[in-house]
């Protein structure tokens, strides 16, 4: 870091000796505290972070590390001595620790004995007990953050994620911080940091020390965290079948899925372990599962210690060739000889494991770029909220082995050949400049163009992707509720809208896109462009209801039933015009029948069958003139025509026969039409009164003509007296009265002949 060249002074007190390591968040230097005359480690924040858009978040975390660690006095916690700001960059002054971290030892040994494991756990719990008493929750306990100093004792480092227990909930940035393989379920689900969460991480770490692997492992970090949330940690005895049940029970107590099922804090867990140790038989202490060392030092930079130059490793690029390397002595607790207590366990335990090689590691900040070989990566995942900005992935790499030259440092006062002294400072400066330039460039690329500039669309757990298939892996069919939790956990911004689907079940994903382009597994969502994942979620098959009044000819739905069904949302309405029927009562176009019944709720694509009315049937008027009334009624009734009957006298048509109709034969009518029909009453009759004989001609004539008859007279002897002697109609004698036709067949008045004397 060019801001702090070797031999440079910070605040007139701390003289930089050399660059120990580079991280994604800060550079760590070995320095001399000129005031107290002791070696310290100084962590200085990178310029691009201190002046970047997320400065406040990084500075908050940087200062939190100082405040959290400084508030705890415990030999098992790396101490922070001082903090400040130099040239606009925050820095921490920390204890300079000689040793290695636990990850290095785990990689070297593979597995540990119960004795070795419980010793590390006991000292870790002691340190956490002090932290918990001070109201501080670490939040990122893992092997990378557990240092084994050169005296063989545990020291916990990296309190950059720590928070006060009273405030250990979702941070203002909405970020979930921690290492996926060791995170407690409540941290994953609610970002709720608890003392019990630290114990859960200790339990997972112990599980890994004994078995050589973590209980949950997956290449997909989302799958990993969901296993922690939804599955119980299996008993360590499932792998270490010869382990003492009380040890397995203790680890199970630490790793219980429910918060309340774990010890309350570090002190309670330490007391439980103390009671366990007092009763544990000798052979139980010696148990060790055989496992091959992982090989290589893949120590996580997030959790490495501030370590002194107690050993050298293969040099980094740029370090002068020929730098000496050597292995330090094994840490005390790992080298203790227990051979005198050897018990034959049938080969199940290795009571005297070989001393592992050790190498120095250097405490970097939690943003060190990831080592590709790291099996358990720290994940940074944002909670819901579209405004949340996810910071560069913190602490997801394993600390790289760093080599330090055993030649005199440029800041030392050692004497040597002048020629060597003139070259070495230049080489070291060039190395520092090149390494820092590379790291700075890499960090810049990572954040602005590389993986830090985008999110990758995660694979749903319930979707199977064929790695050998040429087609892309779609999100379609995945359960949205589960996948939404995944997006929230990863901090991926998203929006949804719901649609009905005939093929995709309710609550499942129909499609996904980013910036209107189809999104599949591993598609990129740009942070720089403020992109978000758009997910279309199925509401299932659309349901709709047949209107209850659809058969009511007087309702709006009844008058146009097909359109009513369309408006209701039915897409599969079956109407066959050839099956429509004529109806006397139902107007044309109104539904006669519908299946299913009105008021039924069904899928929008279910078949709905409708039969419409064609209205009254057209008919042809029959010829009914001259028909009897019964014959007329039968003819019209068959055609569903209505007869309006009237009667009248007719001198030509017999009584009871049809004289006429209002509609001519052959006229086009329809069912229900009315026809006016005139029925004959036959010829009109008139009654001639009796007593006409003997009356005067004039009076009788007047009476008969008044009835409508035509009167003729036949006078005898000239009708001298003018009186009526007989009354006749043709041959019919009506002198005594009688009833006769008023007219003849031609409509002429009937002639009445009077004989006058």
Swiss-Prot record:
Enzyme Commission number: 2.7.11.1
Residue ranges occupied by any Protein kinase domain in the UniProt entry: 14-274
A GO term, aspect molecular function: protein serine kinase activity
Sorted UniProt keywords: ATP-binding, Kinase, Nucleotide-binding, Repeat, Serine/threonine-protein kinase, Transferase
SMART domains attached to this UniProt entry: PASTA, S_TKc
Gene3D superfamilies cross-referenced by the UniProt entry: 3.30.10.20, Phosphorylase Kinase, domain 1, Transferase(Phosphotransferase) domain 1
Sequence ranges assigned to domain PASTA in this UniProt record: 466-539, 545-614, 615-681
Positions of the catalytic residues: 140
Top EC class for this record: transferase
Taxonomy, superkingdom: Bacteria
Pfam families: PASTA (PF03793), Pkinase (PF00069)
Region span, Disordered: 344-387
Family indicated by similarity: Belongs to the protein kinase superfamily. Ser/Thr protein kinase family.
Protein name as it appears in the record: Probable serine/threonine-protein kinase pknA2
Organism of derivation: Bifidobacterium longum (strain NCC 2705)
